[in-house]
Amino acid sequence: MSTLIGTLGSGVSALRTFMKGLEVIGNNIANVNTSGYKSSSAAYSDTFSNILQRSAPSSATATNTAALALGTGVKLGGISTNFSQGSLQNTGRSSDLGVSGEGYFHVKNSGDGTEFVTRDGSFRWDDQGKLVNNQGYRVQGLTGGGLGTVGDITLGTPPVGAELQSVSFDKSGNVIEFYSDGSSATTNQVLLQNFTDQSALVKEGSNLFSGMLAAGPVGAASGSFAFQVGTGNAPGANGLGSIQSGTVELSNVDLTEQFSDLITTQRSFQAGSRLITVSDTILEDIVNLKR
């Protein structure tokens, strides 16, 4: 009887676990058109086993004894993120920035000072001349006279008697402003951040990641997460990718793979459900034997 109860428990663990797997797959499919989205995948592992007999080494009078163990079900072993690059799509807006290669944009919430990184370069200029993302978080980089200050990417002041006509970004992240008098100036540089362990980054929604310190920011001061002047966070340097203005990175979700995983996970869920049904039927038969 206890074995059948254990079988029921295994079936229940399968339903709970594979439901979570279906949630992961469903979230990937739902974000197939989300800029900068990184797909996730679920991994499964067995739960603690009931040891019926422990193994024993061979001796002069007996051969070795194999262990006997009964599994108790399945559990979610972990959820991992696929950080591979998605395709770059042209948008026609110069403030949209894609990264061809490694690196993340660094954005900051000016309200509470929280910082995040993202691969979603859907940026715009706000009414204060700040380069911001869709949530209004400010893009960080080099700014100020001689580009010697780390802070918000901010439009510069046009020359006396001139007006700002257009803004462009080169592959190194330099912000080049063009004025009505025919002059131009490099006023900012968008920087990128790379990590020694991307798997430590935490999804926060809105295509943002936190957990930068745990991920090991390359070039940051010890115990902090901030760009450092002259430490090689420029796009195209030290293994970082280049900036592609007028593009955004698409989701890296592979629909073919997701639908395949959906089918296999659904079958696993159905098998767990069937296990519960069969165990219940056997228990009912046993109860009826006592009548």
PLM regions with names:
Residues M1-G144, P158-R291:
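Amphipathic alpha-helical polymerization modules
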